From Swiss-Prot:
Gene Ontology cellular component terms for the protein in this record: glutamatergic synapse; KICSTOR complex; lamellipodium; lysosomal membrane; postsynaptic actin cytoskeleton; stereocilium
Gene it is expressed from: KPTN
Keywords tagged on the record: Acetylation, Actin-binding, Cell projection, Disease variant, Intellectual disability, Lysosome, Membrane
GO molecular function annotations of the record: actin filament binding
Function: As part of the KICSTOR complex functions in the amino acid-sensing branch of the TORC1 signaling pathway. Recruits, in an amino acid-independent manner, the GATOR1 complex to the lysosomal membranes and allows its interaction with GATOR2 and the RAG GTPases. Functions upstream of the RAG GTPases and is required to negatively regulate mTORC1 signaling in absence of amino acids. In absence of the KICSTOR complex mTORC1 is constitutively localized to the lysosome and activated. The KICSTOR complex is also probably involved in the regulation of mTORC1 by glucose.
Name of the protein: KICSTOR complex protein kaptin
Domain of life of the source: Eukaryota
Disorder: Intellectual developmental disorder, autosomal recessive 41: A disorder characterized by significantly below average general intellectual functioning associated with impairments in adaptive behavior and manifested during the developmental period. MRT41 most consistent features are global developmental delay, macrocephaly with frontal bossing, high levels of anxiety, and some features suggestive of a pervasive developmental disorder. Less common features include fifth finger clinodactyly, recurrent pneumonia, and hepatosplenomegaly.
Amino acid sequence: MMGEAAVAAGPCPLREDSFTRFSSQSNVYGLAGGAGGRGELLAATLKGKVLGFRYQDLRQKIRPVAKELQFNYIPVDAEIVSIDTFNKSPPKRGLVVGITFIKDSGDKGSPFLNIYCDYEPGSEYNLDSIAQSCLNLELQFTPFQLCHAEVQVGDQLETVFLLSGNDPAIHLYKENEGLHQFEEQPVENLFPELTNLTSSVLWLDVHNFPGTSRRLSALGCQSGYVRVAHVDQRSREVLQMWSVLQDGPISRVIVFSLSAAKETKDRPLQDEYSVLVASMLEPAVVYRDLLNRGLEDQLLLPGSDQFDSVLCSLVTDVDLDGRPEVLVATYGQELLCYKYRGPESGLPEAQHGFHLLWQRSFSSPLLAMAHVDLTGDGLQELAVVSLKGVHILQHSLIQASELVLTRLRHQVEQRRRRLQGLEDGAGAGPAENAAS
């Protein structure tokens, strides 16, 4: 299916604050966002280098700093395939970094997974220290995406690595706390929905429902096969499963909610969930209301196939209105931002759907994105990895401060009206009682 061209409603509200050039190119699995929650990004290049990006106070100004991190046991002739980071689930402490690479061994490359984690008290979050503490695992398959997911094991939560391979399968690596190392365990023990695959998984997304033991897992394969599963973690039962076959490899699948409400552990979101599916040959689509309609209610992202293949996507709130936008980045050097317009927009029903808000051009193909607060000011930056390096895009501080002031005025006005209402009610009480 071919999508129609779309016209952007306005200009991109983000400006480029910095650009860091790579010594060699990265790939779609080469960015790990927000390491340790400390506003640091990790970007891996094919030639075995890992760069850490952060902002720091230099001469009373916040400036971007890029530093090469020396991760142990990555040979000079290695080609890095994927990188991921996570914080251990409480009460455990520490940052874990995983890096897959292929070592040049003459006729045939040898694939490895290195897992870095420092158990020394005081060093659990120190990247320089973590980079020296390595578990080196030789793989029997070619690795693709390395990601992580939090899963319920007995009464506690555990974060595990999930690695897709060309065997084709998903491999699970879980920490053995007693031995202070990670071990591969059968994926079906914790993720029964990730078995029986006939094509390599190019992207996997696991979304836990807050306040419940349920989750949605979505995967997209090289063959165009897409699977979404609704699972109860306690019983390990697959409650519902849907699949569809699209044309061409699937570059990204993301489970998300279009609601403006915030998910909290105390108040699970009573909203419909959607899944974004980005294909390398077709327009990106969103399947809405998964739990009720499966993969039946499909909405196109208009014009998303007009700039060569979609290589990566992100669902996040860019315009700061509390509702998510869908960002689509292409090999054709374009970043596209879409917004869902539903009944609340006042548009006729025929015009409900995703509309192109803005687009931005870059000078080389786009590979990966992350939306994280690098400066520590509460506003998230958009990191965009292109073939040439990392672009950091920021909000206009003038526009952001105007938005904050407008919302503060609104809050003050609401509070004033509430207090006025209480005073009016209290004043009317005695008079009403006397009259009766």
